[in-house]
Amino acid sequence: DGRPRTSPRGGSASGKRFQKEPQHNAASHSTYNQEEGYVRIYLRGRPVTNYLPSDVEDYDINAKHPAPTEKLKLDWVYGYRGRDCRCNLYLLPTGEIVYFMAAVVILYNVEEQNQRHYMGHNDDVKSIAVHPDSVTIATGQVAGHDAAEGKPHVRIWSSITLETLHVIGLGFFDRAVCSLSFSKVNVGVNLAAVDESNEHVLSLWDWKKEKKICDTKSSQDPVLACEFHPMNDEQIITLGKGHIHFWNTAGGKLVKKSGIFEKYDKPKFMLSLAFTGNGDVITGDSNGNMYIWGKGNTRISQAVLGAHEGGIFSLCVMNDGQILSGGGKDKKVVLWTADYQQSETTQVPEATGPVRTLCKGKGENFYVGTTRNAILSGDMGGDFTTLVQAHTEELWGLALHPTQGMFLTCGYDKNVILWDFEQHTQRWNKFMEDGCQSAGFHPSGEVVAIGMTSGRWVALDVESGDLYTVHTDGKEQHDIIRYSPNGEYLAVASHDNYIYIYSVKETGRKYSKVGRCSGHSSFVTHIDWSADSTKLQSNSGDYELLFWDAETCKQIVGSKETRDIEWATFTGVLGYPVCGIWPEGSDGTDVNTTARSGNGNILATGDDFGKISLFRYPVNHPKADCNSFKGHSSHVTSVAFNEDSTKLISTGGRDMSCMQWSVV
């Protein structure tokens, strides 16, 4: 897909449960055996046999399978990308704050509690700039999955209509666009961009004409910021690892002068910059020093040494000329007078992490984006409100409450979060001892089970998040954890190829082991319970579809016994009702997750390319048509419908995001 993706668990897997092998076309080899009553598809060369229910008559394998009428509309994005991006939080005159997560740019009106979304990108957004008109916005993205459209580029769009106005740089940028800035004086006709190629190429564009004016190699080292001077359109400043460069753009060329540190310590990283009202440049660095570079000068005219303990990740000049600085290590926000005297100090909360970026709000208020993917609003009084907070590492665990408007997510960051559908807020957030992989609510809605990456699993009280019980099965992650519909059994499907079965008493407060289902030759990827709570079906990493008796933990073989089982849920990727979900050229690992809607009309799937697709259920013809929706940038790890099938929640793996959609 154009860029190496490294697994968070080491190795260069695609950051997910499955290793990629040579591709094999799933759909084109499908066959139908009328006598035996099965459809056979091939995944990576392996036959997968799907038995038809006995009441299916006149089955035609070549019949068209139309897409459903239902579509998805994005309602809410949980999360903000502060962990590895910077300068990515702005306040618009509409009262909306604008920032990004995954492939979505979010315009969030805090007062009215609503979000709008710019959906033009097809992979991770890495950079953003707001035009001097405060309406036009430029956003830059990484190299994507799609060979044709997936090249890194910049999209320029209206924050009022959300229409795309211009697309620039397709085929020019390398890897990703990491920094953007509009010119300020000449009504913002120019746009500067830095990419993540080895040379970190700086380019200058006439964005309305979609024309490049000039470009140059800026630095072998990472570039962390790029800004036009607000009083001089012929000057651009870039800074990063071990450097600050002052660029002159006169005559359509980019000419570089490096900043000279003279008697001052040259820091390992220049981290942040801002401009004062008189045109001086202020920089913050990894040593915690603030340097002031006189207007039009490449030498330090003044220094504030030890302004922070550790790096200064952000600088922001307020409307009255005072300066805010935000610290990484010390988590402090410091207010400085216009002549660099320390005026006030406050600290952001420990739980939300260090300052990544600062943005001025109304009056004396300001917004803080943090390295733990949170956004806060507050003032120097230290009274901070958390507006956005979600996960900070890869995310797989998702469960929807059976009766109330709540859902739960859990991830490798060890956080378990219970969310409110309507309010888009956290009911509680519990920090566990191990990374979390999976979750499932007891049908009573009073208890939720969490599967860990360590082989442990726990049961928590839904109301309070308090721990009821801890169990250990094997030493590997528990990929799925699911209660039977009657609440009397719990199945724990593990990466060690086993499914552990427990009997459940006292609505999920007491557990005793029944046994384990042994028979898979690879790790278990999906499980579903039968409607009568007596049987299970399971998928594995090498495309086995097996059936089990819950009471005895014995495998059920023979198509007659299994073809007519009614399943309480359908979340697997193998079987007759889903044999058409595999796209042309699929290798069997592309689809990570499925969910049948409560009304049984549609099936949602989440794939490796950030797409959520809706199919008409059952998806019983190869190459079925579907409606697909983008928003996630990494593999979609989980999808789930609420009880009345009006909403869908999706989680992205490495994009760390969680999205709430309306089914329309």
Curated annotation (Swiss-Prot):
Q: Which Pfam families match?
A: Beta-prop_EML (PF23409), Beta-prop_EML_2 (PF23414), HELP (PF03451)
This entry's Gene Ontology molecular function terms read: microtubule binding
Oxidoreductase keyword on record: no
The subcellular location is: Cytoplasm, Cytoskeleton
Enumerate the WD repeat regions by residue range.
120-167, 172-215, 218-257, 265-303, 307-346, 390-429, 473-512, 519-558, 631-663
Q: Which GO terms describe its biological process?
A: microtubule cytoskeleton organization
Name the job this protein performs. Answer: May modify the assembly dynamics of microtubules, such that microtubules are slightly longer, but more dynamic.
Cytoplasm among the record's keywords? Answer: yes
One term under GO cellular component: mitotic spindle
SMART domains attached to this UniProt entry: WD40
Region annotation Disordered: where it falls in the sequence = 1-31
- The protein's superkingdom reads Eukaryota
Supply the name of the protein. 77 kDa echinoderm microtubule-associated protein
Where mainly found? cytoplasm
User: Where would one find coiled-coil regions in this protein?
Assistant: none
InterPro entries in the record, alphabetically?
Beta-prop_EML-like_2nd (IPR055442), Beta-prop_EML_1st (IPR055439), HELP (IPR005108), Quino_amine_DH_bsu (IPR011044), Quinoprotein_ADH-like_sf (IPR011047), WD40/YVTN_repeat-like_dom_sf (IPR015943), WD40_rpt (IPR001680), WD_repeat_EMAP (IPR050630)
Keyword line: Cytoplasm, Cytoskeleton, Microtubule, Repeat, WD repeat
